[in-house]
Every structure is written in C-alpha cells, then in structure tokens.
Amino acid sequence: NKAFGDTANHSQSNTNPGYANFDWVTNENATDNTIKLKEAYWLYTKERLFGADIPWAASVGRRPSTDGLPINIRNDQQPNSPLSHTVDVEFDGFSVRLDTENLTGFTGSWFKICGGRGLTNAKPRFDMSGAAYAEDDDKNVDIDMLGFIAVPYDNGQYSVHMNYARAWNLVGFDGQSLNSFNTAYGAYSAAPSSSTEYDLQKATPEFKDVGDIDFATVLFKTEGIGNGISNYLDNSIAFASFAASKTKPNDKGMLGSTDSETGTSVWLGVNAPCPILPDSAKIGLEWNKGSKYWRSMTYGEDTYAGSKIATRGQAWEVYRTQKLTDALSFGLSYVYMKYDYTGSNSFFGADGTP
C-alpha cells in the first residue's frame, strides 16, 4: 500500500542524500538496507476490442517504466516502456495498448497511451492535522504525466518508434532559495560554528512547483545491418534516436529561466557479437549529445555517474555484455561524459541551470 509516486510531505528538499531517495529512483540507488519494490502491476490482455480484430492490453500499478528502448540493448534485455531517451524513471500509473496492424495495414504497428502520478499530495492518516488523504495546501501539488508511444512500422528487422509525453507541476529549487542556501553554505564552510550551522539548516531549500514540460522522441532501429552481407552483420543492431524537451515554467522559472526553453539530444548506437568467445557475448558503442537546455527525465538510468543521456554535452560508452544464464548476465562498461553546461542531472528548477 503506497501513494502513487512520491509524497508531498517527503522531506521536501531531498538534500540528504540528494535525490537518491526520491520515489522515481528508489530501486536504482543503494540508500539503506530495506528492500524496495520495483514493479507490481495488474495486466489484462484480450485478442479482440469490441468485436474488432484488434488485440489490446491494459495495465495499472507500478509499471515497468525503466530500461526502455534503446538503453535495454546495452543491458541485453527486453525493452520496457517508454523510450528511454526522454523517460527512464520508476512510475506508478496505467497504460492501454492497441495492436493496430489489422486496422492500419502498417506492418507491426501499435499504439499505447500511458499516464501516471509522480507525486501525490495527500495528508497522511492519523496525523491529527485534518481529514485523512485530504489535499495539503502547504505542500507541492500532484505531479502527473500523460503521453503516448507509437510504432508505425516494425517488420522484425526495421522499426520506427515515437514517444510524446507531458508532465505537469514538476519540482525543483527556486533561484532565491538556492542562492540563500549557497550563501549560508559558504559562510558555514568558511567559519564553522553553531551559529552558521543553524543558519545553514534554516536556509535548506525545499522543492517547489516550477512548471510543466513536454518530451518527444523519434527512434529508428535495425536488427541486422543489411541483408545477407555476413552472419556478423545479420546479428548486429544499430539505432539512431532524436529527442527534444520544452519547458513551460511558472513565475519561479525552470532550468534557471522564466522563458520556455527547448533542448535537443541525439543518440546513436551499435551492438554486435563479440569476436571473442563465447557466442553469447555482445559488444557495443554508443554516443549521445545534448544541447544547453536539454532536460530528460532519466534519473533511473543505471550508471555510476548519473544519467549519460541527460548530458548537456557529449557522452561516449563502450561496453561488453555476456549472458551467463537466462536470468543472469555479466557486463563491463566504460562511460566518458564531457559536460558543456552545468545542471545535467538535477531536477527542474534553478538547480538545473546550465
């Protein structure tokens, strides 16, 4: 039994330990010795929709919303949804998928609507502050997301994937609070005392609602490079993905700006059989580049140094993965990120200023 997403009364600043204990990434970060639940959802499938030859499925719960295409290629696993170029976080919500090939005539086409709640504003029970689960006007409002995933074509070798989503009431630190905290932190660092420590505690910023954001992704993937050129190329995978983000700030500003800012990112990758035995091993090379105001929601990406896909600058990765059993794999990876701007892995307020 849990709230959808994080809760509005969850130590709002998340300054210790950073964002690591936020609900979107609670299973991607080692925070304490408790066991977390990553996925638990209800799934219903049926072959016909109101008598029409349209297979469909619906699900509700803590859905598999991390490790989507194409990050799953590096991880050597089946893709979840949505596309991981823009969204790779744990999320509580719903989805409805329609297989549209029989309707449109486009090979392998399907369409999915996804929605969820990333933060729930509700007073807890038995806290003596008012009606249980009532809205708390002193806390952040609900964070919601709604979007779609569409595959207009997939013949098993070549496929096109598209993703659009909007998220409302995203959180971050406002500029004034962040500046006050930085000033207090500087004073404490220069002259530690009970007085400067108290001032630092008072200046600890809290997350505020800073605005909305739009995400869009278009991805092309080929499983097999060419046709019959060689067995090696037939067993290789290549992809190219383009994504964009567009902020819609309120008066507190997003990413350090009160204007709507657009960011873009390109992501290219290739995955091929490792020429060194065993046959189950794969090697890969990936490169991505993000612009000044690029902002992805990829906090759940499994890397040591934050999300490489969020990089405002360029990132390279070389990796090798090997299946040990059907359920266990072993991987080695080298990631290099060259930042052109600050704020790549922050949330959506002044802490994300480039």
Please tell me what each predicted stretch does.
Residues N1-S129, I143-M162, S265-Y299:
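Outer membrane beta-barrel
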Residues A30-L37, Y41-K46, W56-G61, G105, ...:
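Outer-membrane beta-barrel transmembrane strands
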Residues Q176-P354:
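Outer-membrane beta-barrel pore domains
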